[in-house]
Amino acid sequence: MIEVVLNPGEVSLSDWKAVYRGAPARLNESAGPVIAQSAAAVERILAKGAPVYGINTGFGKLASVRIGDADLETLQRNIVLSHAAGTGAPSPVAVIRLMMALKLASLAQGASGVRPATTDLLEAMIVKGLTPVVPCQGSVGASGDLAPLAHMAATMIGVGEIFVEGQRLPAVQALMEAGLKPLTLGPKEGLALLNGTQFSTANALAALFDAERLFQSALVTGALATEAAKGSDTPFDPRIHTLRRQPGQIETAAALRALMAGSAIRDSHREGDTRVQDPYCLRCQPQVMGAALDILRQAAVTLSTEANGVSDNPLIFPDTDEALSGGNFHAEPVAFAADIIALAVCEIGSIAERRIAMLVDPACSGLPAFLTPKPGLNSGFMIPQVTAAALVSENKQKAYPASVDSIPTSANQEDHVSMAAHGARRLLAMVEAAEAVIGIELLAAVQGCDFHAPLASSPALESVRGLLRAQVPHLSDDRHFHPDMEAANALVRSGAVVAAASSVELPGVEG
């Protein structure tokens, strides 16, 4: 993989995606002097002797407690240890690696007051594949993602555990074996590592990247389902969508037309078809999927901005030697973005399930009942459709907005929170469930198209059919269905379905 060079404040979504997918990453060397200037400013601010939150005071409700100079290092160590209070299963390594890169890029903007030695260690851990074990639960998304980031910071001072090539090692051992040493934190550094929205943002970005692949896969399987049901491509006529002016809808309709272009199945019923209009699950794909695309893009803009911003507190301004307290740690923008991603993922799966239900119903599709040549003796796709319905219903429950569920913390000092971490963390599970639905639709749509032999679909869709049939044969009689579903899921999840249809350019979240 090509190395990603992080230019603080200017990292593209495609670069963040590459980091999430495992690309090596490092800071632009030009960031070094900026970081050093910020650390020097902290020393000058301390020399003035005035109380400054988080540098020589307590934290949260204890902000009024003044800390003496002799205890400043202990203060920073204590905040890391006391705040490493997360619970639950370890977060995915890919997500935490992205979180580390986000934190590194934020610190490198010179507004957090950390020393170059601190960013050097964090960068080295990313480069050497040392990923802290971070429990997935415990953040309310303000004041930042304190508990998750504390678990990251703890490993930097030799406490906690680190994943190294799949092994879970004590932090000190992992650092030493990689030729690294634990830090002694300086003034402000513990708070700077803990305070920020990087855990929430990493989870939301990871889901956004996976949701983009989900969206594109669903366009392909939706086109295949339209072919299987001998649906019309007339609803995808550009004149219809131009009049509405919704950009995602226009692009989605164009993609569906391109996916079906050159189909003998479609040409076989252009004339003499007594059906006037297809069901909404076919006909309204541009409207539903286009709306999903538009809000995924809206979320992408918000998350890209957040990923390139600084969400620490207080913020250090070296030009004036000021430390200003504010609320950039409040992750409301991330929470809102996560909520709309959840809506998009939910609806992508929902309309796909309706297409599956349509295909297995002979009254709607004109195909054999449950897509089996011998219905009754065989149950065919009866229960896979039930599984799809179950997954869609689970996602509907998870799509409830997290951002409206604030709860006071820290003795009411932190009395309104974003719940961004929960809102973002649920998304990967939602995408995984929706991918399973799309995998079932892939199986059902290809099975349905098989009944139209010797007629073929379009070149793009035939490529996808061939991809599936290389692993999963036509279902003539009932067999153990789970392996077929797992194979189809893997093709969706890996991006192979989208790659097989790559002769058609599919819209993505970056426009």
Swiss-Prot record:
Keywords noted in UniProt: Cytoplasm, Histidine metabolism, Lyase
Pathway: Amino-acid degradation; L-histidine degradation into L-glutamate; N-formimidoyl-L-glutamate from L-histidine: step 1/3
A GO CC term assigned to this protein in UniProt: cytoplasm
Localization in the cell: Cytoplasm
Record InterPro entries: Aromatic_Lyase, Fumarase/histidase_N, HutH, L-Aspartase-like, Phe/His_NH3-lyase_AS
Residues bearing the modification 2,3-didehydroalanine (Ser): S143
Post-translational modification: Contains an active site 4-methylidene-imidazol-5-one (MIO), which is formed autocatalytically by cyclization and dehydration of residues Ala-Ser-Gly.
Disulfide bonds, paired cysteine numbers: none
CDD domains: PAL-HAL
EC number: 4.3.1.3
5-imidazolinone (Ala-Gly) crosslink location in chain: A142-G144
Single annotated GO MF: histidine ammonia-lyase activity
Keyword Transferase: no
Protein's GO biological process: L-histidine catabolic process to glutamate and formamide; L-histidine catabolic process to glutamate and formate
SUPFAM superfamilies tied to this protein: L-aspartase-like (SSF48557)
Identification of the protein by name: Histidine ammonia-lyase
Organism: Caulobacter sp. (strain K31)
Source species taxonomy: Bacteria, Pseudomonadati, Pseudomonadota, Alphaproteobacteria, Caulobacterales
Gene (name only): hutH
